[in-house]
Amino acid sequence: MFYLDTHNILYLGSCLLASVCTLCICRNRELFPHISENKPIGQLYRLMNIHKYESFSIIIQIHHLNLKFGDDDNAKFIVHLKIGNRYAYTHYHKQYQNKVHIEERKNMVVKQNNNTLRLEVYKKGTLKNTFFGSAEIHIYSEIVKKLFPCNVYFNITNKNQIVGTACLSFHYINLDCIKKDDQIYTSLFIETIISVQKNQTKNNEKIEKLIDEGKEHFEAIKETDLSTTIYKNISNLVLEDKIRLFCKNLNGYLLHSNFYIKRFYNKYYFYLHFFKGKFYWCYYNEEADAKMDKNRVGYVRLEYVANVYSDVYSHKYFYIKYRKKNERKENYLYLKTIDKDRNIWVNIIHDFIILVSNYKRERKNKKYKIKEFKDNLIEDTPKEILEINKTLSRSLSNNSMKNKYLDKKKKVEVLSDMDNEENYMNSGDLGPVFKDMSKNMYNYSD
């Protein structure tokens, strides 16, 4: 006989609870950390050659998708990236002539027990997204062994049928090397490291030599890692040299408009000029004009930029809020990306604004210290020595480049009078004079 007493009820309840718990654990076992995530156990796994690599950060750049079956030109697609229990998603992108331009970059972490990177493509529907296809990328054989390749194509399959290809790039960056003080410029560091890594044929030769000597692929990559050396070199630079290096990250093509109307956009090449402690983010019709600072369409002073905003409604648009010198009115610069992720542009400009403000603060402190030092010197030095210093400075200023330039200008004005033949005959070659004058033709109003 089965009696309904308290002991039996407790026994049944505990059995039911245990079965529910085991079911939850089985379903969500990926969410639980692997035993190798413990450092000593992880090192033991590496020594026993069970795992081929340590945990590392990877930057995955999704360039575009080539579709074999493109029936609808207005169809939108989204890409899901999955490594273990970590996910990353792109925005929705339109298909045009069986091609989906994405150009988005995702930063992900690969744990040492992760073996595959899964790429899934979904087509946007009215109520629910429909599965289009997927690609399984083996991390060790297709990424680590190939030394983190760029612009590599992977087949997207659906029910053992190839439905398209995905173009991806992989970058290995040791983000742990960046110190706490420099973490506000992380996006600037990442951009410079990636730009160097794109032309790293010599570094690949070093890695191949180490592999031939008997080292594992990941250990060879880690030993010849450029990110730590580049970061050390940049951090040792003076702030002005650091700015000159980071200026290159703000150069590139963008679509520009003065109004919030998404139809009327002009394609310009944006280029950052840095001189006399001022930052001019100029835009030109062509890249060749930017380097020579010719035919400038307009510019924005980065010192007067208040903030950078991402457009809520579209993933390709962003705008900059800024003020002009001696003006209270707020102006907006509406921009659209072409070949770079919108978030990358926003992060770079945001970090650069912080860098500019820090530079200005440092410069102000230096000026204050010099002034304080001069005031102390004047108090200590006698009047006779001060008068000698004044006369010396006047004589040096007379022989300065500025006065030489003005003399040349006067010469040209005199030589323009054709009636005076003596001056005209003794003129010589006026080419260098006009060359010096043409340097200041493109002046800035502020």
Curated annotation (Swiss-Prot):
Primary localization class, coarse: membrane
Example of a GO cellular component annotation carried by this entry: rhoptry membrane
Keywords for this protein: Cytoplasmic vesicle, Membrane
Coiled-coil region: none
Location within or outside the cell: Cytoplasmic vesicle, Secretory vesicle, Rhoptry membrane
Membrane protein topology class: Peripheral membrane protein
Knocked-out gene: effects: Conditional knockout at the ring stage has no effect on parasite development during the first cycle and merozoites egress normally from host erythrocytes. However, these merozoites are unable to reinvade new erythrocytes. Impaired rhoptry secretion during merozoite invasion of host erythrocytes. Increases the spatial segregation between rhoptry neck protein RON4 and bulb protein RAP1, and impairs RAP1 processing. No effect on rhoptry morphology. Microneme secretion is not affected.
Protein name listed in UniProt: Rhoptry surface protein CERLI1
